[in-house]
Amino acid sequence: MKNSQRILLTLMLAVASAGAFAQDKLDMFNPVNTSVTSQMIAPDARAAGMGDAGTDPDVNSQYWNPAKYPFCISRAGVSLNYTPWLRQLVSDMDLAYLSGYYRIGDYSAVSASLRYFSLGEVMTNYDSTTGESNGMTINPYEMSFDVAYSLMLSEKFSLAAAVRWIYSDLTYDYTDDTSPGSAFAADIACYYNDYINIGARECQLGIGLNISNIGSKITFGGDDNSEFIPTNMRLGLALMVPIDEFNRFTIAADANKLLVPTYPKQEEGESTEDYQQRVQKEYYDVSSISGIFKSFGDAPGGFKEELQEINWSVGAEYVYNDKFTLRAGYHHESENKGNRKYFTVGAGFRMSAFSLDCGYVIATAKSNPLDQTLRFTLGFDMDGIKDLFRR
């Protein structure tokens, strides 16, 4: 696929900024760009209802932090997640996510997930091989599969590692100069869980760190330049506060930073040729590992712009009798780095064997295509299912 065609499809994946920018703001607009941006979409309704803050252990921890699995109460669990994506723009784009885990003994767990992102049907009217219109319908998609192993090093601390295969097919004619892209990546995560006393209440504190998608760049066929995958560092905290025997609150906060170099901006007076040479040297020739370290100090605006590259989320969850749940949250991204700002709400219902959750996005600007995004999660507790068959 030609660059322009793939860029068009990639823009459909990316989260659009809300509203138009004045020219001076456009000059400052400098988001961190990656390929396979579908890897950054939060898949589950629980965290989505809390502003994308996902520190507390649950069946979908594979995405947020797989080191949390040894602290899950149930022996095993499986979840099915579905998100109709950017329905303000298109009617057939969606994300499906399957996740599951199994605890081995009391101190370790294995887990896996499968992600499938469909861009729906896209009509083409140009055949690059003949130069003629063909009215062809294509179905571009991205997918990934990963497995992880987590281990408790003490009663309060655990580590995890995951490996992931990523595949992106945004092409429509498998000619010599274009083909689907694939990449391999790994996650490294740790999690700390402890009980602390706040007044007369024994509260549960969780702190997690996950560096995800550390891996190779991705190349689409004959393109001269490979592209960065979304390597990301996530630091989160959650505090569960019991009110009484039937009621409890959890508050959570996450901070995220893409560990990918910022695309260089053309300097005033710099020729196009010099700029292209500098982009090649400072961006395309940088390896994925070098790019991780470079990402902490390469923003054109200095330290202030580096801080703008940190997205943050805050959320709260109320649980009644381990059955009914209400959630709310807020997600913030600098207007110079993508301008994703939205509130979220969610609700859930849980029985011994299954749970059902939903999340809903309320964007701060109605022009934001994320507005009114829904997520659904159906979870299964293997211990609860076994208990049903024993009755």
Model-derived features: positions:
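Sec/Tat signal peptide C-region and signal peptidase I cleavage site
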Residues: 18-22
